[in-house]
């Protein structure tokens, strides 16, 4: 009799390319198939070589050169040998995806390695001409210096108009004229974090542009699982099902159902199960009944109301740490959300306490955009997120907001580790925004549509209900996904501005169409047309979500809010400068202090509103032994046993 492990998750893999689909439903499949150069320790998250593709990982004294010595006799499931050249080709693929116009917004995990903002800022051309070699050496040692002057000038030029709310009306015409005549500034160019990857004496040598505490940890995530390069197409997208070196291989994948069989070429301990079947059941009720009826052996995202009965019936219900973030992504290129006062108003309007009823015990309010498990101490952490409806209304008055429509995207007909019932959470959340006078229009999207749209550069998308589990043990595992849309915007803009003037096709032809976050660090005047359309909440996407959904209120007239002074905000360039400084620190303790500044800056700039640090539960049948939950919500099945 075959030993088959049957697992149900709440969302189908969008695709089976982990580099372009960095979501749990994809990773849960590829984790059984692909291996990475480094693996995170289960308890500490520290990168190590145990169970990885490497037998040795060496870092140079200056922390710029990382050498990966591969294990011998490792083969892909199709029999092809793993070589250093294979790994180099995978790095080249990640670079192409992170920097390409069509893929920059999707290849979020590879952004810190190759995309805009995380490497070393380049000097302007006129300065390069006169710079000597010693100055170049200084830039390498102090990677953030190059951005300092331009970042400071940017902050001074954009923050000052918002200091006095009474000047808002007087400056309307001048501001509008300035906005129509001010040219779009050329983005700062960056040397990527990874400057070179080459094969040397059978090893892989990676050279960085600056020291990075996160680099090794970044490589532990499934997005960097090594794939047979024979599957890389001309555009570097996969031409078929990924082939890896892990304990299993993908036999078939169709309509959210994936079948995996043991990899006959695997050089590790043979799994004690003969087959894995991963299916998709989008509601917790369906997963619950499939489990108790013996149709599946385990499932993700157990509803809190079912935990008691499952425990009484002898099922295992292991939980995960709340190493996650549920948040509202605020599109700084949107004509209304470009105004910093509107973004701050949303942060002060949200009622986080009302959302807890849809999450398991252990979920907590998120006051910042990073997990509290990093123990980063900040002054007044609630300053930018405390609920204060009066302040929210005053900030909207300061912005000149007048019922302009803001669309809010959220995933429908899906269940995710960070949100089991998106419709309920959306309805509860949006009610608090409507109460302060915001005109929110819901945009429910299928899982595939949501994944494609939530990070793409756009001036149409307003708010998005978003979330994730941290994929590696570093603060940038949280900051990176939150800032990904802005990084993708800058990356694509860099492609446009650096294209030859003679180019008449491709990215250069789309320059005028690019959305812009320019001015998002100030109280820039809202130019969008007010709308008579009222806010509303849609009907639940699923019948089972209809219970306990709070209806969105109709805004009621309130006394005219008084504009308030708007504190200056750091620019996005300054925030990235602070992130680079923290990531270049010599120790985790030093990094923690530097990231406290980043948290404060993000609280002022408010590119996203933190909502919750959510936990989730797994339910496992009595016949399954050895199931171990992981902090990043991606579990490995190769060591399971079935009785």
Feature roles, as predicted:
Residues 135, 140-145, 153-190, 203, ...:
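Gly/Pro-rich hinge or "lid" segments in bacterial periplasmic/extracellular proteins
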Residues 8-61, 92, 243:
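N-terminal lobe/hinge region of extracytoplasmic solute-binding protein
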Residues 231-233, 256, 264-309:
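Ligand-site clamp/hinge motif
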Residues 397-471:
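Ligand/substrate-recognition segments at binding pockets and active sites
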Residues 364-399, 405, 413-424:
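Structural transition elements
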Residues 350-377, 421-428, 453-643:
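Detector for C-terminal structural segments
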Residues 56-119, 205:
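Aromatic- and charge-enriched surface segment that lines or borders ligand/interaction sites
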């Amino acid at each position: 009799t075959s030993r088959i492990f049957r697992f149900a998750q709440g969302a189908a893999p969008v695709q089976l390319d982990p580099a372009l689909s960095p979501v749990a439903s994809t990773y849960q499949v590829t984790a059984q198939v692909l291996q990475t150069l480094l693996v995170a320790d289960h308890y500490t998250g520290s990168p190590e070589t145990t169970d990885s593709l490497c037998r040795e990982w060496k870092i140079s004294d200056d922390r710029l050169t990382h050498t990966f010595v591969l294990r011998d006799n490792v083969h892909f499931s199709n029999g092809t040998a793993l070589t250093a050249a294979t790994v180099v080709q995978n790095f080249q693929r990640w670079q192409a995806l992170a920097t390409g116009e069509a893929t920059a917004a999707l290849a979020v995990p590879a952004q810190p390695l190759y995309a805009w903002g995380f490497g070393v800022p380049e000097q302007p051309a006129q300065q390069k001409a006169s710079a000597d070699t010693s100055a170049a050496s200084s830039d390498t040692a102090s990677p953030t210096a190059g951005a300092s002057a331009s970042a400071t000038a940017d902050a001074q030029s954009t923050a000052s108009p918002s200091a006095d709310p009474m000047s808002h009306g007087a400056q309307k015409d001048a501001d509008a004229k300035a906005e129509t005549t001010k040219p779009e500034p050329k983005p700062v160019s960056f040397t990527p974090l990874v400057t070179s990857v080459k094969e040397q004496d059978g090893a892989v040598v990676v050279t960085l542009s600056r020291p990075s505490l996160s680099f090794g940890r970044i490589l532990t995530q499934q997005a960097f699982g090594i794939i047979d390069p024979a599957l890389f197409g001309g555009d570097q997208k996969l031409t078929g099902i990924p082939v890896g070196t892990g304990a299993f291989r993908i036999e078939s994948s169709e309509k959210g159902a994936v079948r995996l069989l043991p990899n006959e070429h695997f050089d590790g301990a043979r799994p004690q199960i003969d087959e894995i079947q991963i299916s998709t059941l989008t509601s917790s009720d369906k997963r619950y009944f499939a489990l108790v009826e013996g149709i599946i052996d385990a499932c993700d995202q157990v509803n809190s109301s079912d935990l008691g009965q499952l425990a009484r019936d002898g099922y295992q219900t292991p939980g995960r740490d709340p190493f996650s973030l549920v948040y509202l992504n605020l599109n700084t290129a949107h004509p209304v959300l470009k105004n910093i006062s509107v973004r701050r108003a949303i942060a002060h309007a949200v009622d986080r306490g009302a959302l807890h009823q849809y999450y398991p015990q252990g979920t907590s309010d998120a006051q910042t955009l990073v997990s509290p498990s990093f123990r980063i101490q900040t002054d007044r952490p609630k300053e930018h997120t405390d609920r204060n409806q009066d302040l929210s209304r005053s900030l909207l008055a300061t912005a000149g907001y007048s019922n302009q429509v803001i669309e809010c995207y959220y995933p429908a007909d899906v269940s995710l580790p960070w949100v089991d019932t998106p419709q309920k959470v959306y309805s509860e959340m949006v009610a608090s925004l409507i109460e302060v006078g915001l005109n929110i229009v819901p945009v429910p999207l299928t899982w595939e549509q949501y994944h494609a749209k939530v990070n793409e550069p756009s001036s149409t998308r307003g708010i998005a209900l978003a979330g994730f589990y941290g994929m590696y043990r570093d603060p940038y595992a949280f900051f990176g996904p939150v800032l990904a849309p802005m990084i993708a915007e800058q990356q694509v803009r860099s492609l446009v501005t650096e294209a030859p003037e003679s180019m008449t096709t491709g990215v250069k032809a789309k320059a005028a169409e690019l959305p812009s976050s320019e001015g998002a660090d100030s109280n820039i005047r809202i130019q969008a047309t007010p709308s008579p359309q009222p806010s509303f909440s849609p009907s639940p996407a699923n019948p089972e979500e209809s219970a306990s959904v709070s209806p969105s209120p109709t805004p009621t007239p309130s006394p005219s809010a008084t504009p308030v002074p708007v504190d200056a905000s750091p620019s996005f360039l300054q925030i990235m400068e602070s992130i680079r400084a923290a990531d270049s620190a010599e120790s985790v303790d030093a990094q923690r202090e530097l990231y406290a500044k980043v948290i404060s800056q993000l609280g002022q700039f408010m590119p996203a509103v933190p909502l919750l640090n959510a936990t989730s539960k797994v339910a496992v049948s009595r016949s399954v032994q050895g199931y171990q939950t992981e902090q990043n919500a991606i579990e490995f099945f190769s060591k399971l046993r079935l009785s």
